[in-house]
Design a protein with these regions (language model features):
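Rhodanese-like catalytic fold shared by cysteine-dependent sulfurtransferases
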Residues: 2-34, 42-75, 84-167
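N-terminal glycine-rich beta->alpha transition that marks the start or flank
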Residues: 38
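Short, surface-exposed ligand- or partner-binding patches at beta-edge/loop junctions that are enriched
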Residues: 78-80
Length: 167
């Protein structure tokens, strides 16, 4: 694996942890030279993931429980969203006796920016709140209080809270 001592695509670094660029990581994974361990939590992976056989999901929150399932003799690339959690897990794996570990420099964001394969259920742009889309009249909520022809017919003094009544 083509690794470096310093990251190029992220700021967070732990001395002793090696980094690998997304393109080099993809080549190593595709050629069965390494396995990719995704340490993002399951809810993150359900939104966006890498559709390759050599990708294992071992969330950071349970990584210590998963150590028996990770072979110490294989080359391991660790990935998270931006490279911070994966650096920490790569460091942990080294301390636990895994000699061939590298952090995916820049994380999943760098992987996507390199236009490598991934699947997503998120919209192409935006944060998911649809605020970047054109607002169309049929998508707007009609609030009767803001409509004078309707709100003039409502007697707000007689409105009361509906309570659960037991019979």
């Amino acid at each position: 694996m083509n690794t470096s001592e310093q990251p190029k695509l992220q700021y967070f670094h732990i001395v002793g942890v090696k980094h690998i660029l997304p393109g080099d990581a993809f080549d190593a994974i595709k050629n069965n030279e390494a396995v990719l361990i995704d340490v993002r939590e399951m809810f993150e992976v359900q939104l966006e993931y890498i559709p390759l056989e050599q990708v294992l999901n071992h969330p950071m929150s349970v990584i210590m429980d998963r150590l028996p399932y990770i072979a110490k003799d294989q080359k391991i690339i660790v990935i998270c969203a931006h490279g911070e959690r994966s650096v920490k897990v790569a460091n942990l794996l080294q301390y636990q006796g895994y000699p061939k570990v590298a952090n995916l420099d820049g994380g999943f964001e760098a992987w996507k920016n390199a236009e490598l394969p991934f699947e997503s259920v998120l919209p192409v742009s935006g944060c998911g709140c649809h605020s970047s889309e054109n607002r169309q009249p049929e998508r707007l909520i009609n609030n009767p209080v803001n409509n004078p022809t309707i709100s003039n017919k409502i007697d707000f003094k007689k409105i009361r809270r509906i309570e659960n009544e037991t019979k």
